[in-house]
């Protein structure tokens, strides 16, 4: 290996961005095939390649950061900026859904009956499952903060307990959301109300699943003593993402479930 005279990490060539892009193509194409032709083959192939890519890319990053020491202070600074920019891009992603919702609801057209919710739509009660979901996510925000403070203070056991509680609450939220979808009195094809509701809450649910995956990886890493009180950016990034998911849900609840009903 050649001598390195700088603190930056020169990454070796990696196939995972390419396989990740391929899995994204397969998943989106697979969704279309599943929706229109009832054929899940491409979707299953896309999900499989996506899981394999995630596993191997995470493995490489953990090896580089924890075992090879490539994540120096200056590298971590770059990763922080990258995570912040990623979350900002996600804010604008969800802003598009809120724009679509408010554009449709603040000035309902005659085709909708001139009212919101549109004529014939029976909205969900915001004080039932949606309120429970809000409580669950707020509680998970508290537990992830507990985990973070425990880690910084060197209380490994407390950190693991708090992180496990956060993961359990995330899974519980996903199950509640799935049951709500199953029992909803309207579908995604029921006009602008159904499409904005299911796309906005569905993408949020997907982000909860992604965030839960991040936290599960952090939990397994902490079981193997990968994090210290001063070197734990992998966990910190996952915590930032989880707080972002919390805040988006609060806006969804107030806008779509409470005001929109």
Swiss-Prot record:
GO biological process, one term: mitochondrial electron transport, cytochrome c to oxygen
EC number(s) from the headed UniProt entry: 7.1.1.9
GO-annotated cellular components: mitochondrial inner membrane; respiratory chain complex IV
Subunit record text: Component of the cytochrome c oxidase (complex IV, CIV), a multisubunit enzyme composed of 14 subunits. The complex is composed of a catalytic core of 3 subunits MT-CO1, MT-CO2 and MT-CO3, encoded in the mitochondrial DNA, and 11 supernumerary subunits COX4I, COX5A, COX5B, COX6A, COX6B, COX6C, COX7A, COX7B, COX7C, COX8 and NDUFA4, which are encoded in the nuclear genome.
Organism: Dasypus novemcinctus
Family label: Belongs to the cytochrome c oxidase subunit 3 family.
Reaction catalysis annotation: 4 Fe(II)-[cytochrome c] + O2 + 8 H(+)(in) = 4 Fe(III)-[cytochrome c] + 2 H2O + 4 H(+)(out)
Protein name in the entry: Cytochrome c oxidase subunit 3
Record keywords, A-Z: Membrane, Mitochondrion, Mitochondrion inner membrane, Translocase, Transmembrane, Transmembrane helix
Main location: mitochondrion
Residue intervals annotated with topology Mitochondrial intermembrane: 35-40, 106-128, 184-190, 257-261
